[in-house]
Amino acid sequence: MKIVVAGGRDEADFLIGLLLMGKHKLITVNEDMNYCEHLAAVHDDISVIYGDPCKEYVMEDAGIRGCDIVIALREKDADNLEICQMAKRLFAVKKTVCTVRNPKNVEIFELLGVDRAISATYMLAHYIEQASVVEDLVKVMPLENQRVLVNEIRVMSDCPAVGRKIA
């Protein structure tokens, strides 16, 4: 896949390393010259573009048109939304992903066309919520040999199984 990583530092470094293991073609766009020099020195198999990924001409010059995925990792949520919307609307990018600092922006960004908005706080809150539900289940379930098996199956809202008891 052809993937663009826009912005970021530590998270971009980690992500680039993982994506390179998957043999993806990577383009990085970053406005920090020192970071771009670092990336170019460490990775000879990626395109490193120095410039502001919020600028249309920078992304045009980077050659992102028709890419499979754009991943926006800027500090400001608004920048990440702008990058993702620009990628979809102007450059026909198939999928957009971004990080968000404010967990309230996850659902808003997805409503505004970002394919996946990721917030560590949002994910942690959902994990805690799910863990507490499982803990409550375990407290009321009779245990056989101190073992419990809990399965979760997600179904579409129009599935005939919705609201029905499954044995």
For each feature predicted by the language model, list its residue ranges.
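Cytosolic regulatory regions of ion transport systems
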Residues: 1-167
